[in-house]
């Protein structure tokens, strides 16, 4: 599964494995148990996308169980 890209610092969850989805020198920090990953420092740059927006799946609401 591929999560949506990070935009502003600390705003969106992101996938930290593989290529750096945060971009522009920003880093992704892993949250607890693989959840709540965040990009830090400024705005991230979107990862190159294919033609289908459907390739990027939004994180389901139930991923926010704390």
Swiss-Prot record:
Domain of life from the UniProt record: Eukaryota
Region (Disordered): 39-66
GO cellular component: extracellular region
Positions where Sulfotyrosine occurs in the chain: 64
Record carries keyword Secreted: yes
Region (Interaction with fibrinogen-binding exosite of thrombin), start-end ranges: 55-66
GO MF entries: serine-type endopeptidase inhibitor activity
Keywords linked to the UniProt accession: Disulfide bond, Glycoprotein, Protease inhibitor, Secreted, Serine protease inhibitor, Sulfation
Positions bearing carbohydrate: 45
InterPro entries: Hirudin (IPR024793), Hirudin/antistatin (IPR011061), Prot_inh_hirudin (IPR000429)
Cystine pairs: 6-14, 16-28, 22-39
Compartments where found: Secreted
Region (Interaction with thrombin active site): 1-3
Recorded family membership: Belongs to the protease inhibitor I14 (hirudin) family.
Known function: Hirudin is a potent thrombin-specific protease inhibitor. It forms a stable non-covalent complex with alpha-thrombin, thereby abolishing its ability to cleave fibrinogen.
Protein name: Hirudin-PA
